[in-house]
């Protein structure tokens, strides 16, 4: 009971001082039904919300298919308007059919355009600007590139500079080198006069005003009359419009037009003749035709495919014989550059000598000495053979000259003497010449027999003719005569046999193409251009031979066989 009383007291305290007014509405209820309302909503529409009822806040469900169709139609109309009103993509690409070259975009390229790519760093010739390939093309040398002969001139230190230059040299007597701003002890500076000492009459006609040439241009005298400008009401504004009466055309303003001026209005777009530039009305005025307008007979030349292009241009033509069309940078197969070798002979590391290696070294030294001795013997024999051949040729030439002199001194053969059998020479050419001389002598002797009873003068004439004929034949046959000394062929044959035996002793030889250092005790080392002898081809990749007095294995692809 006490609790209930406390609650009532609290509620009374809360409502104390507040007046609560309740409004009573006597109007119609919001939930009253309209007397004219017709409930035309079916049970299905009411349940699924398929119809909109005004005032109820209930909306009809959305038809997705109809919405999609409406959106598509609106999108099509918007796109058509944008295409009609917006910028056309064909402008700048040659027009509608791509033939209006004057409207083509400069940055638009066709299918025939070939972009020039920059070369890779491995293909760029970096020697340009440094004198070419061998550094001798001075016209291509970079201006900032200096060679080893360049000597840079460094600036002198402040303590090394000669500061007397510009002051007349070391002793001050070189007047042409004196600094213009440097003055000597004889210089006298002129100080400016004070304001009270200046003559201000200059520029006003001198001291008495009679020096007209010294009068200031802006200084006027008492006789000067200044002309003041007229007032706006006193100015004559007809100037520039033909004067007072408009008849002075030379004073008329160029921009001022009269009543007789007829302005030529620009034609409307529908009145302009757009046939100009396309050959006129009938397309036959070629001088008025637009250069970028092409007709139906125009055939555009397309760029050839990569497989159809002739890449032989610049390399001497199709068969490489047109030297005037050859590329300057194109090298032929005969322009073979010989590689320069920067090879330095390496010294093989000698192994620790032991008993076996010392014995082997002794044997190798003996073989090397033998090879050098054989080479010296062959060179000595070759020199002796050349000397003997030269001596024998000199003796044969001397004998031939003696025989020719003896023939000239001997008289013609007598009829009683029998012809002696001529010696058979070793040379066939010399044999023919001697037989020809003997035959001619026999004929001359028969002529002498028939002319026994003739006078002695005829006989002498015949003898002189015979000597002339013999001398002529000797002159003809002497340069072509070939001599052989008896026994020389056998001697040459013996020497050739000696060389064959020497070559057989060396066996198969080869020359080294590269350097090779022995990797083991059973291998040999050699340098480029060394000769390897007594080669045994024990395998396709490894052979055995002698080089520098050592016998061992070496790779076969490092050497080249000698013929």
UniProtKB/Swiss-Prot annotation:
PROSITE patterns linked: CORTACTIN, SH3
Cortactin repeats: 89-125, 126-162, 163-199, 200-236, 237-273, 274-310, 311-333
CDD domains according to UniProt: SH3_Cortactin
GO biological process, one term: regulation of actin filament polymerization
KW Membrane (keyword) present: yes
Coiled coil (UniProt feature): 349-410
Compositionally skewed regions (Basic and acidic residues) per UniProt: 366-405
Post-translational modification: Acetylated. In normal cells, appears to be phosphorylated on serine and threonine; in cells expressing activated forms of pp60-src, they become heavily phosphorylated on tyrosine in vitro. Tyrosine phosphorylation in transformed cells may contribute to cellular growth regulation and transformation.
SUPFAM superfamilies, sorted: SH3-domain
Domain commentary: The SH3 motif may mediate binding to the cytoskeleton.
Name this protein carries in UniProt: Src substrate protein p85
Gene: CTTN1
């Amino acid at each position: 009971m006490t609790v209930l009383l406390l609650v009532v007291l609290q509620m009374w305290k809360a409502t104390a001082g507040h007046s609560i007014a309740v409004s009573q509405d006597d109007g119609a209820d919001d939930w009253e039904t309209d007397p004219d309302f017709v409930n035309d909503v079916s049970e299905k529409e009411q349940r699924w919300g398929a119809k909109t009822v005004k005032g109820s806040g209930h909306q009809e469900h959305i038809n997705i298919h109809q919405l999609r169709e409406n959106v598509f139609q609106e999108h099509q109309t918007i796109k058509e308007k944008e295409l009609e009103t917006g910028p056309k993509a064909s402008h700048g690409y040659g027009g509608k059919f791509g033939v209006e070259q004057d409207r083509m975009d400069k940055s638009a390229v066709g299918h025939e355009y070939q972009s020039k790519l920059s070369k890779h760093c491995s293909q760029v010739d970096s020697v340009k600007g440094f004198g070419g390939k061998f550094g001798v093309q001075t016209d291509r040398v970079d201006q900032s590139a200096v060679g080893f002969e360049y000597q840079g001139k460094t600036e002198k230190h402040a303590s090394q500079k000669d500061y007397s230059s510009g002051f007349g040299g070391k002793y001050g007597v070189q007047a042409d080198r004196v600094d213009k701003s440097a003055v000597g002890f004889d210089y006298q500076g002129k100080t400016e006069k004070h304001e009270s000492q200046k003559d201000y009459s200059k520029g006003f006609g001198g001291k008495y005003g009679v020096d007209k040439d010294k009068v200031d241009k802006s200084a006027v005298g008492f006789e000067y009359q200044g002309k003041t400008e007229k007032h706006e009401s006193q100015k004559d504004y007809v100037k520039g419009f033909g004067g007072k009466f408009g008849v002075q055309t030379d004073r008329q303003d160029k921009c001022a037009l009269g009543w007789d001026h007829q302005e030529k209005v620009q034609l409307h777009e529908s009145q302009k003749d757009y046939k100009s530039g396309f050959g006129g009305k009938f397309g036959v005025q070629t001088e008025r035709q637009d250069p970028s307008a092409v007709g139906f007979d125009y055939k555009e030349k397309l760029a050839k495919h990569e497989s159809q292009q002739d890449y032989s241009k610049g390399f001497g033509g199709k068969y490489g014989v047109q030297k005037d069309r050859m590329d300057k940078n194109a090298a032929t197969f005969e322009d073979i550059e010989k590689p320069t070798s920067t090879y330095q002979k390496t010294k093989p590391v000698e192994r620790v000598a032991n008993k076996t290696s010392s014995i082997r070294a002794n044997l190798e030294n003996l073989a090397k000495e033998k090879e050098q001795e054989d080479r010296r013997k062959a060179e000595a024999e070759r020199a002796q053979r050349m000397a003997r051949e030269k001596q024998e040729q000199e003796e044969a030439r001397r004998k031939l000259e003696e025989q020719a002199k003896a023939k000239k001194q001997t008289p013609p053969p007598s009829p009683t003497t029998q012809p002696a059998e001529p010696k058979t020479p070793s040379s066939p050419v010399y044999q023919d010449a001697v037989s020809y001389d003997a035959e001619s002598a026999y004929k001359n002797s028969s002529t002498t027999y028939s002319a026994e009873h003739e006078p002695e003068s005829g006989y002498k004439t015949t003898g002189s003719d015979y000597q002339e004929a013999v001398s002529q034949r000797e002159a003809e046959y002497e340069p072509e005569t070939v001599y052989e000394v008896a026994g020389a062929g056998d001697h040459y044959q013996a020497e050739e046999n000696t060389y064959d035996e020497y070559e057989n002793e060396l066996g198969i030889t080869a020359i080294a193409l590269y350097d090779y250092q022995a990797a083991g005790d059973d291998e040999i080392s050699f340098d480029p251009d060394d000769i390897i002898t007594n080669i045994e081809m024990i395998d396709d990749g490894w052979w055995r031979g002698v080089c520098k007095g050592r016998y061992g294995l070496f790779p076969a692809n490092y050497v080249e066989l000698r013929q």
